[in-house]
Structures are given as structure tokens and as C-alpha cells.
From Swiss-Prot:
Substrate binds at residues 121, 150-151, 182, 188, 253-256, 322. One of its GO terms (molecular function) is phosphoglycerate mutase activity. Belongs to the BPG-independent phosphoglycerate mutase family. Coiled coil: none annotated. This is 2,3-bisphosphoglycerate-independent phosphoglycerate mutase. PANTHER family: 2,3-BISPHOSPHOGLYCERATE-INDEPENDENT PHOSPHOGLYCERATE MUTASE (PTHR31637:SF0). InterPro entries: Alkaline_phosphatase_core_sf, BPG-indep_PGM_N, Metalloenzyme, PGAM_B_sf, Pgm_bpd_ind. The lineage of its organism: Bacteria, Pseudomonadati, Pseudomonadota, Alphaproteobacteria, Rickettsiales. Its EC number is 5.4.2.12.
Length: 501
């Protein structure tokens, strides 16, 4: 081992794009970033498709990105894995056990999930396959639709609803029960007032009532409300859940289903309805004691585990929105803290959308980081700045430019702090977002992630080096080389430090 320590700074949603038009990063005031890329070695990293275990041209996301960063290998992601395993869904033993209990109780099955082809949290085809399997098994099904508008265009819900309606039109035992924008049904920041509105529509049939889903969406559009923010509402004569019913969550990403599933499965008060027969696509969390249709495979010898096995200290810092990413996902789906691993969560601002506070909690993260650097205790510090992604998702380019300038100032403070220390600053991102903010073809804001590469920069390294282009799974091996720690055989990524010269 060397005396070096590493700070891995993940600029969530910061991509590279040579086109400066509608590019919040290129248009923002970034003197420190400009200085960084002019004097330190850099390369490009791919964050999408097969390079991160996703289908070809499938946009990456924060979960996939952090799994790839932390594991140091290409992990076949849940989207691809489930695409294969769901072909035999009618014979899935977990589904058959679930449906047998529904039949014994004379209940019905509630299916809930994000109706989207964004591929980030869910797959529309997965929901349709499960509906078909339940219909085949003679189970009555009601569907609770979560609308996207974030990983898809802001006004695109009717496209997916029409696909769903066309698919179920000849299935007499299947109907649509409720609709909710993901702002309510998929909150992950403990804003339980939002989650409660979605829960009340599902559990009790509370909310404005519409004859059909098309009318519900169109009414919200007429009021200026886009997909993500559509207020939970009820379709037809749906009256709510019964304790004898079953519940399937079709999202395969965990962070945005935990709150709503906790409300559905755990007793909250005497007026609360819970469904004990609940199942998910994967194991979402140790917080949720529910089975899954497609069990996850364990990822061993991640970067965090290796650092711990070396008896070295490591630290993770992020604000609420990205805390799970630098901990749970970075550790390969492990919730337990490694030995000598410390975690600090900085609360995210309590606002409706982050364009209202584009600084988010970046300054607080930076101040905390600097205090920890000065302790000279940690061999590895991992931080995530959420601004470029979370503000970028709003589609507000002016606010996103402010977010980028905030990050630039934070980078300047970090560089000043590590000057004349043994800390090496490694800067990268999990995917792009802020560098491409308008869809010219459809003449609307572009709020999703991008296919652009992200930067990889190594600052404060004691000798001159060159960096190769690569993929996210190459970052952990690079850090191990800097720390002079042997790369385990499970890590199939390669160090990006170019030793050809």
C-alpha cells in the first residue's frame, strides 16, 4: 500500500457534450472546472447499454451507475435479468405461492408500478407479462398506475395508457383502479404527505373520480399538470383494498418503492388497511419483509468490502436524495455497514422541486467533507453531489446552470483543502443529464438521463499520468491501483491509468 488516500467525487448527472446549446454545464460559470480539465489528466467513461449490464442503447441511471462504480465489474442489471426470467413467469414458484393464497382468501390482486418504457425503475412489458400470467391463472386484477414524465417526456402518459388499455381490453378480469404521478407514489425522501395521498387512493379509493384513465390524464393536462405530478385519482367504481387481497409491485428498482410498500404492508393506525400477501420483483430492502419474484444475486468483493478487509477507514457522504446510492447500491445491494465504514447523510431541502433551491445541500456536503479530510483518517471517501441530476430532471436550464456553478464552487473548495495533502481527488459521474436539457425534435424540455459519456479526472496525483477511456466498472480498479491494493479476480474492470508509456 501507499500513503495515498482517495476522494471519489460523483457528480450525479454530469455528462460530456460538445454541443453547448441547451447544455447547462457548458453555459454555467465554472472557473474551477475549467481549470481542472485544463491541467489534470482526464478521459471519458461510458454509462449506458451493455457497458453497465443494460440492453443496447438503454440509458443508464443512478442505481446502475453506483453498482458499476462500486463493484468494479459489469453486473447484469435487473432489467436484463428479469427480461429473461419473466419468460417463464407462469411457472414462477413465487408467483404461484402468491396466487394460491389469493385464491384461498377469495381476494383479488392489486398490481402497481411505473407505467413507462424509460427502463430506469420499471418495464412496461414486465407489467403486461404479469397481467397475462394472472389472467391465465384466473385471478381478478386491478391496476394502480404510476405515471413517469421524468425518465420519459413530461407529457407522454397517454401513449403508455393506450398500450395498457389495448392490452387488457379483452381481459374481463382486469381493470384500471387508480392513477398517480410518481411525485406522490414514488417519493423516497420521507415526504410522507405525498406517499399518503397515493396510499389513500389505492387503499380506500379516495381522490377525484374519473370514468376512464384517459379522462383523468387529460383533465390534469388541461390544468397544466404534467405526468410526474398528476394528483392521485380513482377510475370507475374502484372502492379500495381488502385485507384478503394480494399486491404485486412491478418496479424493479428499490429506492422509490420502499415508502409506498411500507404503508401497504405495515400497520400504521387503526384506520389503516394492510396487505400481508405482498410480493415485489426483487428484494427491495431489509426494511421490507416481503418475498420477491426474481431473487437478486449477491455481489462480493466490492470496493467497499476490499477497503474494509484491508482494515482501512472509509467514509460515505451524500444528501438524502442520493444517500442510498453511495451506500446500498455502491456496496452491491448490501445494507449492512462494513467494518470501519462511516456514513453521513445530509438532509435534502424540503421543496416541491429542486429548481427552487438549485444549490440543494451541496455546500453542507462540502463543509462536512472538508472537516473529515482534515482528520487525515480515511483512506477512501466517497461523496455524491445530486445537483446536476436532480435539478436537471426539472427541465429548468437556468436553475440547472445555478446548480452547476454551485458544484464548481464546491470543487474549488475541495481542491484547495487537499493541496499539500496525500488525498487524490477522482472526479466522475454515474450518467449524464444536465448537459442535454431540451428535446429539439419534440420541442419540449428534456428531463431524462442521456447517452453521453461522463468525465473521469484524477487530481493531485503526485506524478504525471495519462488516462484511458473506459466504462464505470473501471473506476474501482483504478482506485485500487492508486491505493496500491491488489485487484480481486471478481473485479473484471481494468485500471484507467495508462501504463503503455
Amino acid at each position: 500500500m501507499t500513503n495515498h488516500s482517495v476522494i471519489l467525487c460523483i457528480l450525479d448527472g454530469w455528462g460530456n457534450n460538445k454541443n453547448s446549446q441547451f447544455n447547462a454545464i457548458a453555459q454555467a460559470d465554472t472557473p474551477y472546472w475549467d481549470s481542472i480539465i485544463s491541467q489534470y489528466p482526464q478521459s471519458n467513461i461510458v454509462t449506458h447499454g451493455p457497458d453497465v449490464g443494460l440492453p443496447d442503447r438503454q440509458i443508464g441511471n443512478s442505481e446502475v451507475g453506483h453498482i458499476s462504480l462500486g463493484s468494479g465489474r459489469i453486473v447484469l442489471q435487473d432489467l436484463c435479468r428479469i427480461n429473461e426470467e419473466i419468460k417463464n413467469i407462469r411457472k414462477n414458484t413465487h408467483l404461484l405461492e402468491f396466487t394460491e393464497q389469493i385464491k384461498r382468501n377469495n381476494g383479488i390482486c392489486h398490481i402497481a408500478g411505473l407505467l413507462s418504457d424509460g427502463g430506469i425503475h420499471s418495464s412496461l412489458s414486465h407489467m403486461l407479462d404479469i397481467i397475462d400470467a394472472l389472467s391465465y391463472l384466473k385471478i381478478q386484477v386491478v391496476i394502480h398506475i404510476f405515471l413517469d414524465g421524468r425518465d420519459t417526456p413530461p407529457i407522454s402518459a397517454l401513449k403508455y395508457i393506450n398500450i395498457l388499455c389495448s392490452h387488457i381490453k379483452d381481459l374481463s378480469n382486469v381493470s384500471i383502479a387508480t392513477i398517480s404521478g410518481r411525485y406522490y407514489s414514488m417519493d423516497r425522501d420521507n415526504r410522507l404527505d405525498r406517499t399518503t395521498k397515493a396510499y389513500n387512493s389505492i387503499a380506500f379509493g379516495h381522490g377525484k373520480r374519473y370514468e376512464d384513465p384517459i379522462s383523468a390524464v387529460q383533465d390534469n393536462y388541461n390544468a397544466g399538470i404534467t405526468d410526474e405530478f398528476i394528483i392521485p385519482c380513482v377510475i370507475g367504481n374502484y372502492q379500495g383494498m381488502n385485507p384478503t387481497d394480494g399486491f404485486i409491485m412491478t418496479n424493479f428498482r428499490s429506492d422509490r418503492v420502499i415508502q409506498i410498500l411500507k404503508m401497504i404492508t405495515e400497520d400504521q393506525n387503526t384506520n389503516h388497511i394492510t396487505l400481508k400477501n405482498t410480493i415485489g420483483m426483487i428484494k427491495y430492502s431489509n426494511e421490507l419483509n416481503i418475498p420477491c419474484l426474481f431473487p437478486n444475486k449477491k455481489i462480493s468483493n466490492t470496493l467497499g468490502e476490499i477497503i474494509s478487509n484491508q482494515q482501512l477507514h472509509q467514509l460515505r457522504i451524500a444528501e438524502t436524495e442520493k444517500y442510498a446510492h453511495v451506500t446500498f447500491f455502491f456496496n452491491g445491494g448490501r445494507e449492512e455497514v462494513f467494518e470501519n465504514e462511516e456514513r453521513i447523510i445530509i438532509p435534502s431541502p424540503s421543496v416541491t422541486t429542486y429548481d427552487l433551491v438549485p444549490e440543494m445541500s451541496a455546500y453542507e456536503i462540502t463543509d462536512t467533507l472538508i472537516k473529515k479530510i482534515n482528520l487525515q483518517k480515511y483512506s477512501l471517501i466517497i461523496i455524491n453531489y445530486a445537483n446536476a441530476d436532480m435539478v436537471g430532471h426539472t427541465g429548468n436550464i437556468e436553475a440547472t446552470k445555478k446548480a452547476i456553478t454551485t458544484l464548481d464552487q464546491c470543487l474549488g473548495k475541495i481542491l484547495k483543502c487537499i493541496h499539500n495533502t496525500n488525498y487524490i481527488l477522482v472526479i466522475t459521474a454515474d450518467h449524464g443529464n444536465a448537459e442535454e436539457m431540451f428535446d429539439v425534435q419534440n420541442n419540449m424540455p428534456y428531463t431524462a438521463h442521456t447517452l453521453n459519456p461522463v468525465p473521469f479526472v484524477v487530481c493531485n496525483y503526485p506524478k504525471k499520468i495519462k488516462l484511458k477511456n473506459g466504462r464505470l466498472s473501471d473506476v474501482a480498479p483504478t482506485i485500487l491501483e492508486i491505493l496500491n491494493i491488489k485487484q480481486p479476480e471478481e473485479m473484471t474492470g481494468i485500471s484507467l491509468i495508462d501504463t503503455s508509456n
